[in-house]
A protein has these predicted regions:
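Short, charged/polar "capping" segments at the starts of alpha-helices
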Residues: 34-39, 105-106, 152
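Short, well-ordered alpha-helices that flank and scaffold nucleotide-derived cofactor binding pockets
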Residues: 17, 21, 83-87, 106, ...
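Rossmann-like NAD(P)(H) cofactor-binding subdomain of soluble oxidoreductases
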Residues: 49-132
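Internal alpha-helical scaffold of NAD(P)-dependent oxidoreductase catalytic cores
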Residues: 87-88, 107-114, 119, 130-181, ...
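NAD(P)+-binding Rossmann beta1-loop-alpha1 motif at the extreme N-terminus of oxidoreductases
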Residues: 1-51
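NAD(P)-dependent Rossmann-like dehydrogenase/reductase catalytic/cofactor-binding core
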Residues: 213-296
Length: 296
């Protein structure tokens, strides 16, 4: 298939390099400042697919029809990224967002209509230099939740990711894919960022660990109002078994002084909690602590 990847950070770079190394036709769509220093190929160090050096062409604006458009930018960068990928150029491409949070899906549907296939990725991966991606988690797993009319096309995409060495499953429930990720991501990102410690450090801190698990249960209650039935025992196990050294992308952004995806990750939980009368005190406290850490 012909793939375009919008954004070449930890997630976009991983997807692009793995697919290109496996022989797929891949092009990157990059911001001007990233394109300026792009060396013409990706160097990937990955615990899942191994080390890869592969040439991948890049442009500043999508300039050709593709079959799949991966949206792999930060939520804070989405509006700028959309200006570089016109639906008129993308044609009939499946649009697969791998952003954190849930609110981006409705925005993408405003632009691309029924071609959006919501997705989620579980991975620790970061860009450490121009086109230099380091993926350190022992897993890199993608879930896709296509509408019925796009299921066969999504299954073909999943097959290509699997051929490239990444885990990919096609699920029936969009709500469970998006909220299932958020049930782990939000508590973990907020907890690790609030104390600037990796997973093991959070687990060793009784107060932060308690807040993290309580936040996870709050996310589950909110998720139920959106049609996602999540088993809290599964997500508690996931949080308590994160690799000891694993850090969240929010934690890394905070340490580097970059903009945080705080609204994208915590906003839907707090907003929908208020709308449905569901208390979210643990999530609120973690958000407060992240804000305090950000102000230092």
């Amino acid at each position: 298939m012909r793939h375009a990847v919008l954004g070449a950070g930890g997630v976009g770079g991983l997807i692009a390099a793995a697919l290109a190394e496996d022989g797929q036709d891949v092009i990157l769509v990059l911001r001007a400042e990233t394109l300026e220093v792009y060396p013409g190929g990706i160097h990937l160090e990955s615990e899942v697919v191994g080390d890869i050096d592969v040439d991948v062409p890049a442009v500043g604006r999508l300039d050709r029809e593709v079959e799949v458009l991966w949206v792999a930018v930060k939520a804070t960068q989405l509006e700028d990224a959309l200006r570089a990928a016109s639906p008129a150029v993308a044609g009939n491409a499946l649009v697969i967002p791998l952003l954190n949070g849930v609110d981006h899906v409705s925005r993408l549907r405003e632009v691309f209509g029924d071609l959006v296939v919501p997705g989620a990725i579980r991975v620790e991966s970061e860009r450490v230099g121009p086109a230099h991606i380091v993926q350190t988690s022992p897993f890199a797993a993608v879930d896709l939740a296509p509408p019925p009319a796009l299921r066969s096309r999504a299954e073909a995409v999943a097959g290509e990711l699997q051929s490239a060495g990444l885990s990919c499953n096609v699920r029936d429930s969009e709500a469970e894919v998006l909220w299932g990720k958020l049930a782990v991501l939000a508590p973990f990102a907020l907890a690790t960022s609030s104390v600037q410690l990796p997973a093991a450090g959070v687990r060793a801190d009784p107060v932060t660990s308690r807040l993290m698990l309580a936040s996870m249960r709050e996310v589950g209650e909110v998720a139920a109002t959106q049609g996602a039935q999540l088993d809290p025992a599964i997500y508690e196990t996931a949080l308590l078994n994160m690799p000891a050294g694993m850090r969240s992308s929010m934690q890394k952004d905070l340490a580097a002084g970059r903009a945080l995806e705080l609204e994208a990750i915590s906003g839907p939980i707090l907003r929908l909690g208020r709308e449905h009368g569901i208390p979210t005190p643990a999530t609120e406290e973690l958000v407060r602590r992240v804000g305090a850490a950000q102000a230092l």
